[in-house]
Amino acid sequence: MLDAALARFLESGYAATTVDSIADDAGVSAATIFKSYGGKPGLVRALCERALKGAGPIPAEHRSEELKQAEPDSRRLIEGWGRLTAEVAPRVAPILLLLRDAASGDPLASALHGELDRSRLKRMSLNARHLVAAGHVRPGLGLAATRDVLWLYSSPELYDLLVRRRRWSVDRYSQFVADAMIAALL
């Protein structure tokens, strides 16, 4: 169902996609989708959750936490975050951008977009707190500024601009994100 939903959303957009069309594509009833996901917002939430897990058997968020605990060198830590950002962005950015674009015309999409954006900001706050507490950021750069830098460079908009629109490779994007965060923070 999720694969059918993703394909339909990306092809038709959020507003034009119906649960019935997703159900037809998935070979299930609309009632099954409503029972499993509660409708379009629930499908998008499930798609985001799946995308944020990343490519490996261990979810990217857990690998980020493991990296924080295992890597004492701030430069290598941020390079690792750059790789994780580049791993997750191709999966999640199109979904988040679709939701962002739908938010102005759909209150449920707007609420979900706000929730997911706040969740990313919270994750970046935790990462910033780690960097600041460990004394990794340059003097004068506080928690809020560190958080905002991490939040900026993990944004779906940046991925969209560089990879989807400017045709950068994901490897180039990964290196850019790491280099830019290092330059801004260390």
PLM regions: where:
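Solvent-exposed, amphipathic alpha-helical segments
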Residues: 4-11, 64-67, 95, 149, ...
